[in-house]
Amino acid sequence: GNEYLDYDYVVLASHADQSLRILDQPTSDEKRILGEFKYVANTAILHTDENLMPKNKLAWSSWNSISKEDLSKTCVTYWLNNLQNLKCEENYFLTLNPIQKIETDKIITSVNFTHPYFNLRTAKLQNELFSLQGKKRTWFCGSYFGYGFHEDGLKSSIEMIKDFKK
């Protein structure tokens, strides 16, 4: 709602662009740094369709890339049984941004989300993210502190907690 809540501290564990939108009165540094991080839409499909894997099963790996001839579109299929050490007979895959059809009856679920898009500017600004910590009692963490992976979000939260405790 529109009610005003008062807190001692705020931790924004979200994407940089979301954090910036949440802030009622962002500082000039928060605008400058967080505002540079852009995000791209992605689709992830959990499925059992082996057609998105190499034809030769000996070539299967945890991460499998498929691209078109012009290389403008590339997708990745993760072989979850291998990647997550799943002990089951059926093979499970997670495909990001598929460029070929996945058999409908083999789709388990689909989810849309965004990932940070990094460039030279944001790579340089990552070092400045730490200068925002604790200003106006606001703390930040998220995958944009690293390479955009979930593990980077976790790592940034651990680092944030260490700074918070000082």
Label each region the model flagged.
Residues 1-116:
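Mid-domain catalytic core of redox enzymes
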Residues 72-166:
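Conserved flavin/dinucleotide-binding core of flavoenzymes
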